[in-house]
């Protein structure tokens, strides 16, 4: 990055080097991208960007479609989703918020635990909690799939996981309150902030 005309900041005793100016697109780049062909690196970066967009918008759009615009879904998917959401005790917004909170708790617990316990805790915790919650009628199977895809997609860019979690919850609240209009409005505000930030 220094060869691209940027400045570097090194602090004595810290293993981290900062380069200035910082651009958001840097988070989608990996050091492995420089050791493969340009086509492979481009495909990897596009895949990371797509995964981040999915991590942000999947829960919010699922809730917005379920609450306000269920007819947007294709007929086959509509039948599957409507069969999975019958007799649920939670509203779609609360259901998704509950599942995202459980996902964050599982991630935090697996980070704090020793390595040999963390894997078992995360796998068994996710399987047991997910299966029990579906059988108890608290959550639906499509919601668990959406949250799992969103959680996995967020870790394609590990440096952004904290930010993605906060923005994902904000988009979920906007979708639960005014539907797709809320998602579009909040997305426009986020893009405005990113463009005007120094």
For the regions a protein language model found, what residue spans apply to each?
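Hydrophobic alpha-helical transmembrane segments in multi-pass membrane proteins
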Residues: 53, 70, 92-96, 100, ...
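Hydrophobic alpha-helical transmembrane segments of membrane transport and translocation systems
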Residues: 141-198
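Membrane-interface elements of multi-pass transporters and channels
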Residues: 69, 84, 109, 113, ...
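Residue-level signal for the membrane-embedded core of alpha-helical transmembrane segments
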Residues: 54, 93, 97, 121-124, ...
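Alpha-helical transmembrane segments of multipass membrane proteins
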Residues: 60, 101, 105-108, 127-132, ...
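Short, non-helical or kinked segments that cap or interrupt transmembrane helices
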Residues: 89, 111-123, 136-142, 159-162
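Cytosolic regulatory modules rich in charged/polar residues
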Residues: 1-95
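Hydrophobic alpha-helical segments embedded in the membrane of multi-pass proteins
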Residues: 97, 101, 119-128, 147-149, ...
